[in-house]
């Protein structure tokens, strides 16, 4: 059926049993890897939940916004139960290996980026949007989801990494000269480029780049802060989460506690910047 052939009457004729049938198909008969010689069937609960969420949003729009439907057949449908799993993160030893592995023409830039991920737990999108003016003596200004501003403190080792990188950055003229991190073509660094440099560093450190990513470095920062005794609500503020988990309500933490959180993160003590002192490789 083509979308252009679907009219409002077709949608009105769909009832809850049809949605149940679709969800059953997803759980049991939908091919996960259809191009494989031996495809597996049944997509994950998380994938089914995302599809049901889209359907719920569609019917809510038709019933509450456009008033084209009087009844919502999916209003009372429950989401699939999701398997709870602990997020993957690097150990202290793996984090040290990752930082020690950084090399190449962009060594100082890449080292500073990894230090910011491990110390501040920021998102990739937040990192690529950092400007020179967002860097303060002991913290960075971050614009997170929903265009919300927060300040995240970092430790002395992270400060040294940024200071080692800034002279190289200041020699470059970027198309967006506000950008803290630039690329080899003199543009603001992209999310894709950050993904590649993290993957490269993971491989050089002998770590599985299919299991770890920039987002896993965010998990690492959060885990290490918690293991260092930081209150979960403080970590929530550092990460810029409205909810640290599904039941946690966002709580504002005073800046002094955020600074303590930065120093309590064991990763803030890792410092391998001396290995770059004799390396004058230039950014590209």
Could you describe each region identified by the protein language model?
Residues 1-284:
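Conserved catalytic core of the tyrosine transesterase superfamily
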């Amino acid at each position: 059926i083509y979308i252009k052939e679907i009219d409002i009457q077709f949608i009105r004729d769909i009832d809850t049993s049809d949605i149940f049938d679709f969800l059953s198909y997803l759980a049991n008969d939908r091919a996960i890897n259809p191009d494989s010689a031996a495809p597996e069937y049944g997509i994950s609960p998380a994938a089914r939940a995302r599809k049901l969420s889209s359907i719920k949003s569609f019917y809510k729009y038709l019933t509450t916004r456009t008033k084209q439907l009087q009844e919502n057949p999916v209003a009372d449908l429950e989401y699939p139960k999701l398997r709870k799993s602990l997020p993957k993160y690097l150990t202290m030893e793996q984090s040290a290996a990752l930082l020690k592995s950084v090399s190449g023409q962009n060594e100082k830039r890449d080292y500073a980026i990894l230090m910011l991920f491990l110390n501040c737990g920021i998102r990739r999108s937040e990192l690529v949007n950092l400007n020179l003016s967002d860097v303060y003596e002991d913290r960075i200004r971050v614009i997170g989801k929903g265009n919300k501003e927060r300040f995240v403190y970092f430790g002395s080792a992270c400060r040294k990494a940024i200071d080692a990188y800034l002279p190289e950055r200041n020699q470059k003229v970027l198309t967006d000269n506000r950008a803290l991190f630039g690329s080899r073509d003199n543009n603001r660094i992209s999310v894709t480029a950050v993904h590649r440099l993290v993957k490269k560093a993971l491989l050089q450190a002998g770590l599985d780049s299919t299991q770890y990513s920039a987002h896993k470095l965010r998990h690492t920062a959060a885990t290490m802060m918690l293991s260092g005794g930081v209150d979960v609500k403080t970590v929530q503020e550092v990460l810029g989460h409205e909810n640290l988990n599904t039941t946690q309500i966002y709580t504002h933490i005073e800046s002094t506690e955020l600074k303590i959180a930065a120093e309590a993160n064991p990763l803030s003590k890792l410092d391998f910047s001396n290995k770059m002192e004799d390396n004058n490789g230039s950014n590209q």
